[in-house]
């Protein structure tokens, strides 16, 4: 499954079913740029079980505020629309897999 780019309007629909890893990021954020290829690898390896959604906090401040995003990158694991895990900052692939696997 390809990584989905969400907006304030589409975020709820994109995260309402199954296990979703939501990446709150911004184009100017160095650690966000570092985590992008890690998310691509996760998508290739786990895309059949996991949906990855990216949301630009500069363009979608309403959703970032709703979820209390204060620092980026912030990664939320949602299961059927409910937040079950939160991670702030860059994490290696193995740490993200561990974060997600608990909820698959």
Swiss-Prot record:
Q: List the disulfide bonds.
A: 29-32
Q: Which family does it belong to?
A: Belongs to the thioredoxin family.
**SUPFAM superfamilies reported for this sequence:** Thioredoxin-like (SSF52833)
Q: Which InterPro entries match?
A: Thioredoxin (IPR005746), Thioredoxin-like_sf (IPR036249), Thioredoxin_CS (IPR017937), Thioredoxin_domain (IPR013766)
According to its UniProt entry, the function of this protein is described as: Participates in various redox reactions through the reversible oxidation of its active center dithiol to a disulfide and catalyzes dithiol-disulfide exchange reactions.
Q: Which residues form the Thioredoxin domain?
A: 2-104
What cellular component terms from Gene Ontology apply here? cytoplasm; cytosol
Q: What name appears for this protein in its UniProt entry?
A: Thioredoxin
Q: Which domain of life is it from?
A: Bacteria
